[in-house]
């Protein structure tokens, strides 16, 4: 594994490091993020059962008209509120794991995390 690690890009190395840290916190629900230049996707995943409890993205009908193909702070707040709206209220009291993938914790990722924390998420 160590030899293969040397041939990976810095993006892939960061992704592997973050995934290894997430494995240590098994038993919690995971908030997974994917972003592109045009869209932002979020899922709340139960890894023990292998199911997705709730999801939200800028492709949803409620947000698509506001987003207009660009991801900014306003659309991030709307995606977080949509995720909270779709989540059962009993699940909101649990602790979560924030899976940022290979993305650095700056910009839109940190704004999304702060929006969730202000709504009552604990991670």
Curated annotation (Swiss-Prot):
GO molecular-function term, one example from the UniProt record: structural constituent of ribosome
Main function: This is one of the proteins that bind and probably mediate the attachment of the 5S RNA into the large ribosomal subunit, where it forms part of the central protuberance.
Entry-linked Pfam families: Ribosomal_L18p
Assembly: Part of the 50S ribosomal subunit; part of the 5S rRNA/L5/L18/L25 subcomplex. Contacts the 5S and 23S rRNAs.
Gene that this sequence comes from: rplR
Keywords from the named record: Ribonucleoprotein, Ribosomal protein, RNA-binding, rRNA-binding
Gene3D superfamilies xref list: 3.30.420.100
Calcium found in the keyword field: no
Organism, as annotated: Wolbachia pipientis subsp. Culex pipiens (strain wPip)
PANTHER family reported for this sequence: 39S RIBOSOMAL PROTEIN L18, MITOCHONDRIAL, LARGE RIBOSOMAL SUBUNIT PROTEIN UL18M
InterPro entries cross-referenced by the UniProt entry: Ribosomal_uL18_bac-type (IPR004389), Ribosomal_uL18_bac/euk (IPR005484)
Top-level taxon in the UniProt lineage: Bacteria
Name of the protein described by the UniProt record: Large ribosomal subunit protein uL18
């Amino acid at each position: 594994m160590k030899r293969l690690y040397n041939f990976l890009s810095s993006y892939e190395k960061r992704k592997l490091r973050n995934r290894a840290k997430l494995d240590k916190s098994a038993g919690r629900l995971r908030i997974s993020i994917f972003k592109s230049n045009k869209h932002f996707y979020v899922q709340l995943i139960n890894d023990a059962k292998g199911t997705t409890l709730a999801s939200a993205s800028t492709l949803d009908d409620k947000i698509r008209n506001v987003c207009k193909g660009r991801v900014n702070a306003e659309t991030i707040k709307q995606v977080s509120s949509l995720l909270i709206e779709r989540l059962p209220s009993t699940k909101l009291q649990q602790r979560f794991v924030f899976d940022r993938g290979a993305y650095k914790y700056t910009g839109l990722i940190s704004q999304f995390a702060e929006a969730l924390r202000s709504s009552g998420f604990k991670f």
